[in-house]
């Protein structure tokens, strides 16, 4: 008799995705981030659900309801900080996952890559609306500044901003709708992640060498299930260490002050995972130009498969491209640092140079390096 996992309609799907899935035998730990992102998403949904049971999306009570969760709800403090720091872990895994895709040429699977970019945008939107919910100073002013950017859109800008706000400023209506968005988006992300996986399993996984691995595949279980469990344990240990020893390390102290429309914080800045895009936004003196650059800093990922000029898929055997890749990583970190600094000399000029380099590397230098490498190899 055939095993039930191979015949049952539901079990069959799980079996083909996580148990009997043929997987390249040589994928490294950089391939762990997919499962870690799944784990992060499940953790965020669960902690978020418990937070939503006690949170009130109203301008008068939002801040105090978060304080109530931390002080009066059983283990509310750990649920809140797991959720806040879980978002940071989520983005660390996301950026590592994207970096892996860039380095090893995983973007050649175009459908998987494009859905991944949509997923990134959805996660960023979720994190942004979520940051507004505690209704601290940085929540309020972050929401005001970022939503206000849409007013740069010609003709419809102002109307659009007021439509999103539900009034003439960030107020009760804004907070309520942001809570609704923050609740629904993770479930949309979950569905998109399933589609992401569906497209990946159409082609099978890439591998570090970027060559076909059909002749050398092993079952996902037990080899990669055990490897994923190790990755998950490491993630949980790091998250718990962050949550229990330094819960506010990555947060902003301004968010412990209740929102006050009459007093602007000295330095308005988003959470650390948006700082690179914020630095690019601030580098351009024109409002509309800045907004376009902000969106392009993410959407540029969609052009990467079209700009692949190398005859090889992976960067494993391409030293020029490797150098430019790590330069891009350094540039990303530089932008992240600049985004958290005040708008003054020398940070402004550094930010502008880093922003130019960011787009130059992705759109010009990396495709050119690939062509040079092809020539050197007489391909």
From Swiss-Prot:
Source species of the chain: Ziphius cavirostris
Family in the record: Belongs to the cytochrome b family.
Protein name: Cytochrome b
Residues forming coiled coils: none
PROSITE patterns linked: CYTB_CTER, CYTB_NTER
Annotated compartments: Mitochondrion inner membrane
One GO cellular component, as annotated: respiratory chain complex III
Miscellaneous note of the record: Heme 1 (or BL or b562) is low-potential and absorbs at about 562 nm, and heme 2 (or BH or b566) is high-potential and absorbs at about 566 nm.
Gene name of the encoded protein: MT-CYB
Topology in the lipid bilayer: Multi-pass membrane protein
Amino-acid positions noted as binding heme b b562 in the UniProt annotation, renumbered to this chain: 83, 182
GO biological process: mitochondrial electron transport, ubiquinol to cytochrome c
């Amino acid at each position: 008799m055939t095993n039930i996992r191979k015949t049952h309609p539901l079990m069959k799907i799980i079996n083909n995705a996580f148990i009997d899935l043929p997987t390249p035998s040589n994928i490294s730990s950089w391939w762990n981030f997919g499962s870690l992102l799944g784990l992060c998403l499940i953790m965020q949904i669960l902690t978020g659900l418990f937070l939503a049971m006690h949170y009130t999306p109203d301008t008068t009570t939002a801040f105090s309801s978060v304080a109530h969760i931390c002080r009066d709800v059983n283990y509310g403090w750990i649920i809140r900080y797991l959720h806040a720091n879980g978002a940071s872990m989520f983005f660390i895994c996301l950026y590592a996952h994207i970096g892996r895709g860039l380095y090893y040429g995983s973007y050649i699977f175009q459908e998987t890559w494009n859905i991944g970019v949509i997923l990134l945008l959805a996660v960023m939107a979720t994190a942004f609306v979520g940051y507004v919910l505690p209704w601290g100073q940085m929540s309020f002013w972050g929401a005001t500044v970022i939503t206000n950017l849409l007013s740069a859109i010609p003709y419809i800008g102002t109307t659009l901003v007021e439509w999103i706000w539900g009034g003439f400023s960030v107020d009760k209506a804004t907070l309520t709708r942001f809570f609704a968005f923050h609740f629904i988006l993770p479930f949309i992300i979950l569905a998109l992640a399933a589609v992401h996986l569906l497209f990946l399993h159409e082609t099978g996984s890439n591998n570090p060498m970027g060559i076909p691995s059909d002749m050398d595949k092993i079952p996902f279980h037990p080899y990669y299930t055990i490897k994923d469990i190790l990755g998950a344990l490491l993630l949980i240990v790091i998250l718990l260490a962050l949550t229990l020893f330094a819960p506010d390390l990555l947060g902003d102290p301004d968010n412990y002050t209740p929102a006050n429309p009459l007093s602007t914080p000295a330095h308005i800045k988003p959470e650390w995972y948006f700082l690179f895009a914020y630095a690019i936004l601030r580098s351009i003196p024109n409002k509309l130009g800045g907004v376009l650059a902000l969106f392009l800093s993410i959407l540029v990922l969609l052009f990467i498969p079209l700009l692949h000029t190398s005859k090889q898929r992976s960067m494993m055997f391409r030293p020029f491209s490797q150098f430019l890749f790590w330069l891009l990583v350094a540039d990303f970190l530089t932008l992240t640092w600049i985004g958290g600094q005040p708008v003054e000399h020398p940070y402004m000029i550094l930010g502008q140079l880093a922003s130019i380099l960011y787009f130059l590397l992705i759109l010009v230098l990396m495709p050119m390096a690939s062509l040079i490498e092809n020539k050197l190899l007489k391909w």
